[in-house]
């Protein structure tokens, strides 16, 4: 039974998973937020401004991509990352949800977070924030943010 569970749910390297989530939420997520646009109205306006395929009546190679198409694909993918990130934060427990929302959605500093929530600095960094980031890794479903321990003590990432 344990072998089946290990194959379905391999052992997670907690420290490296926490670091991976910090990187995702601190670096990748802000980029995707900027790339996604601010509101659905902005998105609709952006689509309307993009040029459609240029048609001049001459035969063209069908494999050539239009820059507008690539821009739309990047924007839609960024919007999915933003949407799934917010959903994942919302699925965490109340303390983790509050912390992750303040830190990564409202752009609070870590100091502002632990002072607002009311934890000591050491308890925040040693327990509360790592726990919140591990919960986020469990609830984020677009990509696997976990870093796994393999049988040979090597690590592998789902991302």
Language model features with spans:
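N-terminal interaction/assembly modules
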Residues: 1-89, 142-159
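Amphipathic alpha-helical recognition patches that constitute DNA-binding helices
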Residues: 20, 123-124
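A short pre-motif secondary-structure segment
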Residues: 99-100
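Helix-turn-helix DNA-binding module
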Residues: 106-123
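DNA major-groove recognition helices of helix-turn-helix
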Residues: 124-143
